């Protein structure tokens, strides 16, 4: 296939190479697109899209350090573009999730809190907001900040209960709450939370588990399909009010 020899052409070449699993070729094409967009000027959104996609690419290549650098550069460029609040929120969420998995907890917390700030200004999918609170809960739990962790998991439940097909995710939150209440000696609340988790797991068709870490959002992130990366909300599951469990 013939591609134009400009930034958009190399961007398309990178997308096609990535779709075919030719990751090294995709990396080179994204980098060439970035150089050409920089030369064109006034193409910060396009540059941001390249760095954003490179972040996803590096995750697939198991190069998390480079993924962090790419997402951070994308975030810098999104900040210069008007109307990019959704993209900023999504990138903060990805970075927070990735840094949490890398055990860089302070940086993870900063990005997750920044994502929450963006959600106040830019409408976003409940599932993304829930995942942000889940990861904050994990940060707080690992930092022995139990009361903040309880609050974060409860906030995650608020958002998950606004979305369809989130029984498994709600179960994870209740499992975490059960664990936290148990550690604090609140056995009644702990038992109620574990029971809620078991009911939700059955509803989701999953067997009860002792402990399951929250899913790693950064690893599940889908690459944007066009030159302007959509806030991951565009690909998220549809929303709709569902009945949730009562909280202990």
Residue ranges, per PLM feature:
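Short coil/turn linkers that connect adjacent helices within long alpha-helical scaffolds
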Residues: 1, 39-42, 80-84, 121-125, ...
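Alpha-helical segment of the N-proximal tetratricopeptide repeat
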Residues: 3-35
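Conserved alpha-helical positions within TPR/SEL1-like repeat arrays
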Residues: 8-21, 45-60, 86-101, 127-142, ...
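Amphipathic alpha-helical segments of tetratricopeptide repeats
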Residues: 34-36, 75-80, 114-121, 157-162, ...
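Short, charge-rich amphipathic alpha-helical segments embedded
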Residues: 35-49
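TPR/TPR-like (Sel1-like) alpha-helical repeat modules
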Residues: 151-154, 158, 187-205
């Amino acid at each position: 296939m013939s591609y134009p020899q400009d930034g958009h052409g190399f961007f398309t070449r990178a997308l096609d190479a990535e779709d075919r699993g030719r990751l090294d070729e995709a990396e080179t094409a994204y980098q060439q697109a970035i150089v050409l967009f920089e030369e064109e000027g006034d193409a910060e959104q396009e540059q941001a899209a390249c760095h954003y996609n490179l972040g996803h690419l590096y995750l697939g290549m198991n190069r998390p350090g480079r993924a962090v650098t790419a997402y951070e550069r994308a975030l810098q460029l999104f900040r210069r573009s008007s109307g990019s609040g959704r993209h900023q929120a999504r990138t903060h969420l990805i970075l927070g999730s990735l840094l949490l998995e890398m055990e860089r907890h302070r940086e993870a917390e900063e990005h997750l809190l920044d994502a929450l700030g963006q959600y106040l200004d830019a409408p976003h999918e409940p599932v993304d907001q829930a995942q942000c609170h889940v990861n904050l809960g994990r940060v707080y739990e690992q930092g022995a900040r139990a009361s903040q962790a309880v609050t974060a998991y409860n906030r995650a439940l608020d958002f998950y209960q606004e979305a369809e097909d989130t029984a498994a995710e709600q179960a994870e939150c209740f499992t975490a709450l059960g664990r936290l209440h148990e550690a604090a000696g609140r056995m009644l609340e702990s038992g109620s939370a574990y029971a809620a988790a078991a009911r939700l797991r059955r509803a989701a068709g999953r067997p009860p588990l002792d402990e399951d870490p929250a899913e790693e959002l950064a690893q599940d992130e889908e690459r944007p399909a066009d030159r302007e990366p959509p806030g991951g909300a565009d690909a998220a599951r549809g929303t709709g009010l569902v009945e949730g469990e009562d909280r202990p």
